[in-house]
Amino acid sequence: MARTAPAASFESLESDLDQKFAYPASSKTYIPGSRPDIRVPMRTILQTSTRTEKGEMPNPPIPVYDTSGPYSDPDVHIDLKAGLPALREKWIAERGDTEVLPGLSSEYGRDRANDPATAHLRFAQLTNPRRAKAGANVSQMHYARKGIITPEMEYVALRESLNLQALYDKPEYKALLRQHPGNALGAGLPLRPEDITPEFVRNEIATGRAIIPANINHTELEPMAIGRNFRVKINGNLGNSAVTSSLAEEVEKMVWSIRWGADTIMDLSTGKHIHETREWILRNSPVPIGTVPIYQALDKTGGIAEDLTWEMFRDTLIEQAEQGVDYFTIHAGVLLRYVPLTADRVTGIVSRGGSIMAKWCLAHHKENFLYTHFDEICEIMKAYDVSFSLGDGLRPGCIADSNDDAQFGELRTLGELTAKAWKHDVQVMIEGPGHVPLQRIQANMDEELKHCYEAPFYTLGPLVTDIAPGYDHITSGIGAANIGWMGTAMLCYVTPKEHLGLPDKEDVREGIITYKIAAHAADLAKGWPGAQLRDNALSKARFEFRWEDQFNLGLDPERARSYHDATLPAEGAKIAHFCSMCGPKFCSMKITQEVRDYAASLPKEAQQGMEEKSIEFLKKGSKIYS
């Protein structure tokens, strides 16, 4: 349902866009915090009862992590032109270390605000931005290192635990909460839901093992954490280009992405109206928004990398920080001396940001200005609490180029920059590859942990083979599940259109679901507390032929239902004890249930006799022939 309407049609966005949505058989619930304005959302999936000979046995509701914000709350009115409620406004103001500016600090921002040519695109409900008071640092890391537990940290603790500790004493959840031991591969995961406390979150932020990307100007944000010792998160990309996609479509894609489970969104726009597109997305986004500021800076030069300047880039950082961008991808590790190391690669430099900075370095024969001005960038970041996503500008673009000197040289420089950012108490995550065959993935995680001091790793896949254009959501999902288990904190999704074109809504959905699978598989492998609850509930529903519950407990209920109904569309098939794969006579689960029923119906004496024969068999050494 991609739209190609011009940006000028944005006036009709509110009527065009399906803003509200409801998940099937679900309710929006909130976990209360220590103060009335801390209400942490989660989704509860309702189940039908199990039919037995003794009557119906109820099945308990299943709580799941929710990224959809107010869009799935039937009690909240969504007005895209007004933006979402300013959830964090009071928290930020009462800390007393910020000030509301009299106007925009960015020259470009002021120009756009006063340009009559963009008046019809402008978000009308803008307020003046905030900035740290002189000498103040407003980053979550700074507060954490001072021993302060912020409302954002408490919010994250409640969100990560889902209040599961309350379920462990309830008999109806006992079987559902069974979980295989995980292997956290050295990570310090909480062992039980009750261990996920605000103090646990504060400590993870203070050490740099996790970040809470939360710009003080993105007050609509529902705080979340990215870190090795939390749930594995996923990022979804959107953004217009010079050849396709309208402003309204990007807002629609944002809402669509969080519906399917994107934990953060990166706006990678390179086409028209980048500033206005970003404003509308931010004001209506409950999840953190990241950008690559060099893209917009390049747009300001007319696309000529050689004309980039530090002054122009600095103005772009301030412009975006005052809009509320939560994390910046900064390609400060692409050093002049690393560029020649890519000469013998099969695919050279595939990162857009990396290639821009490499071209600038070669054109001027100077060191990367993002590297030389890094301390000044840190000063901007801590004034707005923007997190670094230190870009892997020299990531491999094919498996042949994986783990080479250029890639790992840059990674070591990112570790150096991480230490420098932490001296400013600025939050950092590290971007990673890319294209890496399975047997070389572990080395990427090991190198990141070693050289970047356990700062959260944020990887694009990696793709484990290069032979499947059109299916790279699968080739990358395989790598993502593996590296997520090994310790990567956030996985950047890949869609089926990767390497082929700009994704549309269905591509976005496909990519997000693929990566939700990868992230959940990683959580199971690590042993995240309660991760297996949803699996157990769905497996029980499957065995009991509760088809509606199977659909609703899945990551994509619509897809599951449509596949089932393609061959068995009748409503009666929703209670049938078979599907079209095996039919009514060959369903293994149906046969197993019949065996159980038969065993249960045997006289007590017959059951006792079989037990005696079993004991006799075991005493003889379990030998069939003697």
Curated annotation (Swiss-Prot):
**Note describing how the cofactor binds:** Binds 1 [4Fe-4S] cluster per subunit. The cluster is coordinated with 3 cysteines and an exchangeable S-adenosyl-L-methionine.
**Pathway where it operates:** Cofactor biosynthesis; thiamine diphosphate biosynthesis
Reaction catalysed? 5-amino-1-(5-phospho-beta-D-ribosyl)imidazole + S-adenosyl-L-methionine = 4-amino-2-methyl-5-(phosphooxymethyl)pyrimidine + CO + 5'-deoxyadenosine + formate + L-methionine + 3 H(+)
The record ties this protein, via Pfam families, to: ThiC-associated (PF13667), ThiC_Rad_SAM (PF01964)
- Sorted alphabetically, which InterPro entries does this protein's record hold? ThiC, ThiC-associated_dom, ThiC/Bza_core_dom, ThiC/BzaA/B
Do the record's keywords include Oxidoreductase?
A: no
Disulfide bond sites: none
Recorded GO CC terms: cytosol
EC identifiers of the protein: 4.1.99.17
Keywords, alphabetical: 4Fe-4S, Iron, Iron-sulfur, Lyase, Metal-binding, S-adenosyl-L-methionine, Thiamine biosynthesis, Zinc
Binding of substrate occurs at 237, 266, 295, 331, 351-353, 392-395, 431, 458
**Binding of [4Fe-4S] cluster, residues:** 579, 582, 587
- Co-factor(s): [4Fe-4S] cluster
Q: Which residues form the signal peptide?
A: none
- Record: residues binding Zn(2+): 435, 499
Would you kindly state one Gene Ontology biological process term found in this protein's UniProt entry? Answer: thiamine biosynthetic process
Matching Gene3D superfamilies: 6.10.250.620, Radical SAM ThiC family, central domain
Q: Which family does it belong to?
A: Belongs to the ThiC family.
Described purpose of this protein according to its UniProt entry: Catalyzes the synthesis of the hydroxymethylpyrimidine phosphate (HMP-P) moiety of thiamine from aminoimidazole ribotide (AIR) in a radical S-adenosyl-L-methionine (SAM)-dependent reaction.
Quaternary structure note: Homodimer.
Q: What is this protein called?
A: Phosphomethylpyrimidine synthase
The record lists the organism as: Cupriavidus pinatubonensis (strain JMP 134 / LMG 1197)
